[in-house]
Amino acid sequence: MTIVQSIVEIVLNCRDQAATRTFYEEVFGLEFMGKPMEPGPVFLKVAGQPERVPQMIVLVPLPPGSGEFTSPRSLHHLAFEVTPDTYDQLERDLRERGLEVRGGTHPLVPSRTLYVDDPEGNEVEVICRA
């Protein structure tokens, strides 16, 4: 039996923190948490209940001139669950933004699934129950 209640943070390294922040705020509606810490990490709230630790994506800036990632990246993708109505609207919005939207299937869960890349090249899955 698991003792874990929730995953609360996904931390992403960013060459362009501002563009990545804008992507998650505008595309997925994530909310900025706290005060700006320049330079430093940006915390974006994904979800949460008042009595619990919020679920967050943390954007950590790489030093200027870092260039391409030199080692294999361990993050395959991150996934957001949305409602079926939100899924349809989000798919339209992503295409209108000119982003490449890729389809997919989940191996275990009957669902509708799409994939898109954030400005850093991280793959983001959007999934809803079929």
What residue ranges belong to the model's regions?
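Short glycine-enriched loop/turn motifs at secondary-structure junctions
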Residues: 3-6, 71-75, 107-108
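Core segments of cupin and vicinal oxygen chelate
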Residues: 13-57
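Vicinal oxygen chelate
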Residues: 2-3, 91-130
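Acetyl-CoA-dependent GNAT
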Residues: 60-65, 128-130
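Helix-adjacent hinge/juxtasegments
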Residues: 59, 68-72, 76, 81
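Short aromatic/hydrophobic contact patches that present stacked aromatics
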Residues: 9-11, 43, 77-79, 113-115
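Short, conserved charged micro-motifs
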Residues: 19, 85-90
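N-terminal beta-strand motif that seeds the catalytic metal site of vicinal oxygen chelate
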Residues: 1-18, 78
